């Protein structure tokens, strides 16, 4: 590593050389062993340099980063040399490391995306490497033991994945065709599928955004599951072998007395090797190898993490796609870490034949709100908001006997239900309110005006003391007893006729009374017409 000279010195002390193969590791325990004499031996226990990735279990997250970006960040921080070239090139919307060591997390990424992962003695390899040189091994010469094996590993699989942004459920299944297998591997693959005909139904482990991704996932998953359909094991004294070495394996076939013909049984990549160095120049290795043409390695035997509900704070609700999603920061997310845009659980949500969007209960948490986050499939890469939480500085409860239920928005608009009074009150940010007091009374209060409208007809009351009513056709007033009107001035104007009819009619002016007609004024009675006054003038 180049991060410090001290680290380089440590590595130099940990290099093991088998005469061509270099293994760089980290010594984790040193002891003195003495037995049956006065002399002693130094015992050293250690691991590959990937041990530096064995941090304590931790959490981290990335948004819009590629697999290459994530793995390089982790290996660079740990000072581990790495060759990173995954087949998955696209940026991931959200990826979460959840209570895992850094190495366990990298293993899980290799499992989720079916990427190659191994340590070649000097470098952590993530992604299928470029083909290197080939080493020829012949049984009876470099190879002292050779086992050629095949096994029934292939299984048909199918499944689905849901993408919420476009409300699409994608279905896919494995192609059930072998890839990169030799003759033995192909035969084992076909035999396995003949044994297991019913496909297993599974979900895609990574988040899927389209059907092409789902089809590719099931294809690579089946390739990975069946990668070891054909394999060999062997014992060799060839010192240059390591994990990732390509070997061309030959066997000698006896065709007659003293006649042997050497044939290649194929090229293989070593996936597991044990080196044994004894006293003096003694050396032996034991290895397992798979056909070198396989597209993926077997999945790492690593469990998927199980995410638990946890607390978070909303950092944004300005969803760029206007879908009502939020971004949150969980307690362990530091610095720029936060989730991608995630959905919010609500009591009711959907559409109808009359409502295309937002049918249901739409209440998106505000920035700074404390929320509880859960995870679909318990997958840390699939968070959603389960609900909101009050804390000691934001909640006051429902009052004595829990009598009050209320709904209040950011601006102060409030609906309050009082179970003690049986009342309902609605109030806006200015204090304008509607109150039904539970005793048969309704009060509407406004600081400026109240307007009742039906079509173009309206009644308006304003804060300056005016009440007006307007009707396109008729206004009818009726009372079983009395109607009283009182004002400084009362003006009544009719565009055509103005009729007043009653059993008795009295018009009185305390100072004067005037009845006039521009064209004609008529006073008519079927009985007696009386005109009286101190002075009566008829002109």
What kind of region is each of these model predictions?
Residues 1-7, 11:
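Single conserved hydrophobic/aromatic residue that forms the stacking wall/gate
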Residues 247, 309-516, 522-523:
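Structural signature for extended repeat/solenoid scaffolds and their inter-repeat hinge/linker regions
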Residues 52-70, 84-108, 112, 142-143, ...:
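Short acidic/polar beta-strand-loop edge motifs in secreted extracellular
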Residues 12-82, 94-95, 134:
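Surface-exposed cap/loop segments at beta↔alpha junctions
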Residues 31-46, 276-289, 321-327, 382, ...:
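Short, solvent-exposed secondary-structure boundary/capping segments
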Residues 20-28, 254-269, 378-388:
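Short, Lys/Arg- and Gly-enriched loop/turn segments at beta-strand edges
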Residues 99-104, 110-291:
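Extended, domain-scale alpha-helical bundle/helix-rich regions
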Residues 47-49, 64-84, 207-214, 316-347, ...:
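Glycine-rich, acidic and aromatic/proline-enriched surface loops and short helix-turn segments
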């Amino acid at each position: 590593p180049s991060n410090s000279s001290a680290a380089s010195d440590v590595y130099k002390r940990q290099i093991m050389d088998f005469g061509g193969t270099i293994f760089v590791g980290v010594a984790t325990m040193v002891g003195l062993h003495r037995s049956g004499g006065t002399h002693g031996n130094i015992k050293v226990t250690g691991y590959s340099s990937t041990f530096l990735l064995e941090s304590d279990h931790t959490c981290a997250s990335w948004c819009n980063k590629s697999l290459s970006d994530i793995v390089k960040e982790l290996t660079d921080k740990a000072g581990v040399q790495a060759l990173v070239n995954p087949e998955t090139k696209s940026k991931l919307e959200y990826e979460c490391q959840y209570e895992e060591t850094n190495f366990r997390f990298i293993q899980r990424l290799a499992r989720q995306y079916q990427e190659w992962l191994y340590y070649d003695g000097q470098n952590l390899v993530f992604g299928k490497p470029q083909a290197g040189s080939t080493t020829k091994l012949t049984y009876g010469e470099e190879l002292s033991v050779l086992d050629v094996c095949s096994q029934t590993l292939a299984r048909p699989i199918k499944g689905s994945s849901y993408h919420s942004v476009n409300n699409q459920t994608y279905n896919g299944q494995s192609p059930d065709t072998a890839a990169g297998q030799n003759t033995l591997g192909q035969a084992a693959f076909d035999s396995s599928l003949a044994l297991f005909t019913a496909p297993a139904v599974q979900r895609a482990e990574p988040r899927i955004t389209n059907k092409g991704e789902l089809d590719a996932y099931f294809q690579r998953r089946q390739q990975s599951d069946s990668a070891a359909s054909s394999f060999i094991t062997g014992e060799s004294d060839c010192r240059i072998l390591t994990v990732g070495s390509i070997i061309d394996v030959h066997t000698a076939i006896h065709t007659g007395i003293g006649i042997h013909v050497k044939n290649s049984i194929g090229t293989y990549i070593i996936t597991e090797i044990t080196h044994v160095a004894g006293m003096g120049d003694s050396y032996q290795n034991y290895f397992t190898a798979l056909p070198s043409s396989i597209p993926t390695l077997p999945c790492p035997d690593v469990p998927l993490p199980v995410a638990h509900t946890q607390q978070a704070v909303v950092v944004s609700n300005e969803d760029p796609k206007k879908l009502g999603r939020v971004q949150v920061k969980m307690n362990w997310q530091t610095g720029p870490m936060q989730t991608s845009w995630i959905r919010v659980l609500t009591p009711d949500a959907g559409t109808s034949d009359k409502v295309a969007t937002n049918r249901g209960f739409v209440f998106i948490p505000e920035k700074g709100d404390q929320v509880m986050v859960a995870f679909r499939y318990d997958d840390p890469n699939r968070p959603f908001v389960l609900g909101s939480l009050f804390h000691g500085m934001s909640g006051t409860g429902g009052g004595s006997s829990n009598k009050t239920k209320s709904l209040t928005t950011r601006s102060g608009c409030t609906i309050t239900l009082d179970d003690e009074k049986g009342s309902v009150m609605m109030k806006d940010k200015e204090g304008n309110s509607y109150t039904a007091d539970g005793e048969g009374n309704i009060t509407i209060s406004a600081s400026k005006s109240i307007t009742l409208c039906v079509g173009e007809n309206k009644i308006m009351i304003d804060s300056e003391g005016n009440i007006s009513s307007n009707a396109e056709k008729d206004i009818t007033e009726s009372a079983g007893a009395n109607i009283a009107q009182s004002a400084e001035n009362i003006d009544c104007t009719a565009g055509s006729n103005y009729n007043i009819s009653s059993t008795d009619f009295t018009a009185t002016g305390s100072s004067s009374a005037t009845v006039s007609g521009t064209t004609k004024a008529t006073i008519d009675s079927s009985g007696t017409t009386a005109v009286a006054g101190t002075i009566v003038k008829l002109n």
